[in-house]
Amino acid sequence: MKNINLKIADITQEDVCAVVNAANSSLLGGGGVDGAIHRAGGEQILSECKKLRTSLYPNGLPTGEAVATTAGEMRAKYVIHTVGPVYSSCKNRCEELLANCYINSLKTASELKCHSISFPAISTGIYGYPKYEAAQVAYKSVKSFLETDESMEINFVFSSKESYDIFADAIKEL
């Protein structure tokens, strides 16, 4: 699909309107993509996340929801934080929760008047979601969104060739 791109790159260096952070529910940073985005964006991201925790999400951001902050010192304008499902504990709701991450991130980007967004492979790291299945959920979700908003340019950004190849193979099957 013309609006969907796959690439191997550093997501913190993306020159897009919004970068999606595969966050943990605390919104306070962590490992993997979450830690990299917090480090690259600097104190502004953490400061806004702390405000969100005290105002809107005292118990943390729920799985599948999305919320935006500044991107701080990164090239992007916004970071959209979303919490993916932990595969071992999401039971029969894994696909729905992961799809919600993508759909709600895209809705948030659209509300912010963004026309470009970069996603990591949400939940495929420490959260253990099988990459091939996650790729199919991601692709179906963004494809569905593009049926209502053709103006969005969507990037899937991977830190490894292995992840890139798995996602590329998975979406060929759809």
Regions found by a protein language model. Give the residues of each.
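Macrodomain-like recognition of ADP-ribose-binding/processing modules
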Residues: 1-174
